[in-house]
Every structure is written in C-alpha cells, then in structure tokens.
Amino acid sequence: PEELREELKPIAEMDALIEERTGAKPGTVGGFFTLNPRVDDIPERFSVLHRGVRLLEMGSVELGGSGCICPEAAMLKTLFTHLLFRKDDILLLDMYAGVEHLGRATVDFVDAMLVVVEATRRSLGTAKQIKKLANDIGLQRLYLVGNKVRNEDEAKFLEVESKDIPLIGFLPADLKVQEADRLGIPVYDHVESVKVATHHVIRVLNELT
C-alpha cells in the first residue's frame, strides 16, 4: 500500500545513522571508519511489514570511481551480509544488473540468482555479462526468466538464444500489469497470467535448488 511505501527511506540516505554506526560522515572517501558497523537492529527498525512480507529499501551508493570505499558502502555491504546469515528468513533481493552486493564470503548463502531478461539480444548480452561477474566470485547457480514475453516467437527466441544460462520460465506481457499499477494494487492479485507464470517459475526453481 502507498501509505506503507511512504514510510520507507533508503538506508543509504540515512546520514545520521551511517555516521553513528561507522564513525564517519556519508560522502567521506578515505580516512578512518568502521568497516563492519552494527546492523542487527536495522531490518526490524526500518522496514515495513505487509501480508507477512517485510520490505527494506537499501538504496544505492553513488561513487566517483570504481573500487572506492566509503561509509555508505560499508554499511550496505555489512547489512546485506547480515540478512543473508539470518537462518529463519527467506531473502529476496531486487538488484540492479550486477553482483556488487555479493562477495566470495557470502556467495555460499545464495541459493540462486534469477536474471530477468526481455526477448532482445541486448538484454541477453547483459545477462551474459552478469553471468561472468557472478562466476568470477564463485556463483554458479544462475537462471533466466523471460519478461514481457508477447508471443510464441519471442518465447522461442529466448529458448534458442539462452544457451549459457538455463531458462526456467516466462512472465507474459499483459496490459493488466499497467492497470494494476494505475489502481495501486498488487500485480500478483490482479493479473492471473502473471500469477500462474510466477508459480511455474517457483516450482521449477524449487526442483533445481
């Protein structure tokens, strides 16, 4: 619901909290700060709970150069590692096209990575880049999910061209998805075709993992 969504604030933008936990002001590059700040209380304090699902917005860190270390990055990486180590939770992480939050120390706790692609060569090219980055840190359990698939030709294209990563399902293009967004209601509840397709992906994923 929109009222719950408005309660969320990205952790990466909580300057006072980051300074309190790391000992340095956000935006600081270099200098001294804590690389493993306390984060155990953050999931419950700064998330919202709806229908048994807890949502936490981590945010992103704008860095001037690759390999740059800053308090915000240390905070997010420590928080992500903490979430992976929680034994009683199922963690779903919606990430940008990359594996920047993952590392060799945490990869064993990742059951699978789903790479969502559209039926275009550019999208599949991005998927191959993600696969290489994931393999570089030891993550081998990658699977493709086709998104916004409009017809059999697009489904066939993905089946033929997705040779490097197993394809485990498709999410159909359905105008009711946009309708659900306009109405402010969950796609899962409003769009039966997407719900059925999602159940199929989950079933296949459970069989593979």
Which stretches of residues belong to each language-model region?
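A short acidic, helix-capping loop that chelates divalent metal ions and anchors anionic groups
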Residues: 64, 178-181
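Cytosolic-facing regulatory segments adjacent to core modules
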Residues: 30-46, 54-93
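N-terminal phosphate/diphosphate-binding loop that engages ATP/GTP or pyrophosphate donors
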Residues: 1-51
